[in-house]
Amino acid sequence: MSTNSRQILVTCALPYANGPIHLGHMLEHIQADIWVRFQRMRGNEIYFVCADDAHGTPIMLKADQMGVKPEQLIADVQQKHMADFSGFNISFDNYHSTHSDENRELVEAIYHKLKQNGFIKTRIISQLFDPEKAMFLPDRFVKGTCPKCKAEDQYGDNCEVCSATYSPIELISPRSTVSGATPVLKESEHFFFDLPAFESMLTEWIRSGSLQQEVANKMQEWFEAGLQQWDISRDAPYFGFKIPNTDNKYFYVWLDAPIGYMASFKNLCGKKSGIDFDSFWSKESHAELYHFIGKDIMYFHSLFWPAMLDGASLRKPNNIFVHGYVTVNGEKMSKSRGTFIQAATYLKYLDPECLRYYYAAKLGSRIDDLDLNLDDFVQRVNTDLVNKLVNLASRNASFIQKRFDGKLADKLDDKMLFDEFIAQSELIADYYENREFGKAIREIMALTDKANKYVDEKAPWVIAKDESRTDELQQVCSMGIELFRVLIGYLKPVLPNLAARAEAFLNTQLTWENVASPLLDHQIAPFKPLFSRLDMKKIEEMIEASKIENAKANQTAGKSAVENKAFSEFEPIEESITIDDFFKVDLRVAKVLKCEAVPESNKLLKFILDIGNETRQVFSGIKAAYGKPEDLEGRFVIMVANLAPRKMKFGMSEGMILSAGNGGADLYLLDVDAGAKAGQRVK
């Protein structure tokens, strides 16, 4: 390791230990892995750790539903997670669990430090309590009628129709989603972290200029709304770590989860000599610390986590790198359409490096959603990697092997072209460093086109027919292989398996530093196929397999729901109504003329609808399900046309758009068959 190398610790968000890894998860882990592999190629001392997030009410309830102990559930899930990450070549130095001795010790130590420094407060709060299950109910395990807009079946913390936020005790007609019972109000002493005490420090962190602008802007919004003390405790029964010196209080999962980063690294330090835990986590640390996370957990990582570290006299992250969501063919991943694809399912049908390349080609440093367009996926992989990159090696290697026994020429045929390729090294490195992977890929593929143009113009297949041009043939084909070597070196962080096969063929190891050193008078190995074409049939098979797997999962959930209503996918049928009651509801086919996000709301989309003889403005709380509202323009929806207009903060809503699902990202707009027209009544 160079004496000038950087010391870096990188983490990914911890996958929750109650379900499988899917292609949405893989975006983050691939993004982080590419960055880590690049840093290794640059000679930096870097460690890459992660763990399963293994505590909380959902895990406790799912284990109970399955008839196993939570410890068994999380152990089984962890093995599957690790297999998925290994299959996608995610090169963790350590993968651990938050349910570990290291994490318990660190959680208790940080808690004691926060308490000692005066940042832990206690007070009595009133909570909803399930009398049948004898448990306090987290916000998301209570449903009822919104106290603001009177929308039914809303969660205990916010309304997905009007975007109002409220306390669970404000819900009208609340019910427990665990047992179906009507909860009662019960008092309990809770422990709070004094987040407002850190507003000055967090404001200064924003102004450092290192955070993504979108993150800094969002943090500023939270400051303007006012920071609140954070409840870090939960009452028994709960699966997690007990708060010291209490009888029935546990640390909230979001307190111990980020500390899991530290625990995984501490576990690594115990297994590998020469790594000093404190040199990475002490207040005086000069090491770099980066967290790769999704935008859905930005709140915890940009506010609570740095404040908690600062309050415990530990170092803060240098940065948090936030990414967007994955959509498939322009829509959110769908279980019914088979585009909710588990990592394990993908690995049964396709090469993981295809997805690594495609994600890299579309990733930038902003918090933008990434669309996995399956047609474009096939075309881009086959064009870039097979037709251009790998073909560059194969079309030259055959001549070198047959005519020159695998020996490359002792000089470059076109040194200016070689120097041009090497001159791009630092630009490409800069793109990698700043997570502008898409720009790096575009630069590399532009060089690939130049390399193929060189071979096309030199036409070695023509030169080979002239015995007097033997030396020229060796130099031209060697030059083609040299350019291939440089390109593979640049792509090694993205395509480690392809790079390993190329290294075996080239009979050399590729580092960022030695890319500039040509292989003159060098022996290469016989060429073997390096990469296979993507077949759309295999993708179609994968989609069908996903549909079947998702259907089986739903069936299993349905059976379990008989025993435990918390995991029921379907709500009970409402009380019967008369036909006259039904006819009072005027349902109409509506065409979406315009759709846009409401900037001030996390839930709402604003629609302008054509209902035949007039247009209507309607607000709908489906933003989480449809991340690209403009894609909805031109399609038909079903709306309640005779619902009384409701004045909202953002304007008048003149109806309601119908959708099915459980809320949040799990919502699906109702559609009509071809031929239906705007304004027609649904009967």
From Swiss-Prot:
Enzyme class, broadest EC rank: ligase
Catalytic reactions of this protein: tRNA(Met) + L-methionine + ATP = L-methionyl-tRNA(Met) + AMP + diphosphate
Cofactor binding, per record: Binds 1 zinc ion per subunit.
Residues noted as binding Zn(2+) in the record, renumbered to the chain: C146, C149, C159, C162
Motif ('HIGH' region): 15-25
Compartment list: Cytoplasm
Placement of sequence motif 'KMSKS' region: 332-336
GO MF, any single term: metal ion binding
Family statement: Belongs to the class-I aminoacyl-tRNA synthetase family. MetG type 1 subfamily.
Protein name per the record: Methionine--tRNA ligase
